[in-house]
């Protein structure tokens, strides 16, 4: 019976990110080639994401003025010259799947809680994400029970992708 309250908390916890309006991806943000990311690209993405911790949450946000979950990931990779789709679901479809035990800094981590949610893995079982209104961009533990429950997989961004 404890699973019902946990599921309810999970659903409420990330509902803020889920409601972002679905916009068509920019023309340059098609499917990313399924090539492994250069370690340097991933490390730079993780470093940039870590520097954005504390930025406010903003529904539909995709700039340092405020981010939603997929806007944060989109912004980080755009700053590094890599084009990604704008929504969490489209980002999930655009990356090469990576098992949880092979995640590297810069990889994306996805959750269904109950809506699509995405964060950027920074190493040591930690990721950076924009969870919901009222909270800003923050670090979280991938191995926390809250995130284990809704984990949907990891993915690697191709180094050769670009806008």
Where are the regions that the model predicts?
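Aromatic- and glycine-rich peptidoglycan recognition patches
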Residues: 18-40, 44, 82, 91, ...
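Catalytic cysteine-centered active-site loop
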Residues: 53-105
């Amino acid at each position: 019976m404890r699973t019902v309250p946990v599921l309810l908390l999970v659903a409420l916890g990330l509902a803020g990110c889920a409601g972002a309006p679905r916009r068509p991806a920019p023309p340059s943000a098609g499917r990313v080639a399924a090539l492994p990311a250069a370690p340097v690209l991933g490390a730079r993405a993780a470093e940039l994401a870590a520097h954005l911790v504390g930025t406010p949450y903003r529904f539909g946000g995709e700039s340092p003025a405020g981010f939603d979950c997929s806007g944060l990931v989109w912004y980080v990779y755009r700053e590094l010259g890599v084009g990604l789709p704008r929504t969490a679901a489209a980002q999930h479809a655009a990356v090469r799947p990576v098992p949880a035990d092979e995640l590297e800094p810069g990889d994306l981590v996805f959750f269904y809680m109950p809506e699509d949610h995405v964060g950027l893995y920074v190493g040591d079982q930690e990721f950076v994400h924009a969870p919901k209104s009222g909270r800003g961009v923050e670090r979280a533990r991938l191995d926390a029970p809250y995130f284990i429950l809704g984990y949907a997989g990891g993915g690697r961004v191709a180094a050769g992708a670009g806008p």
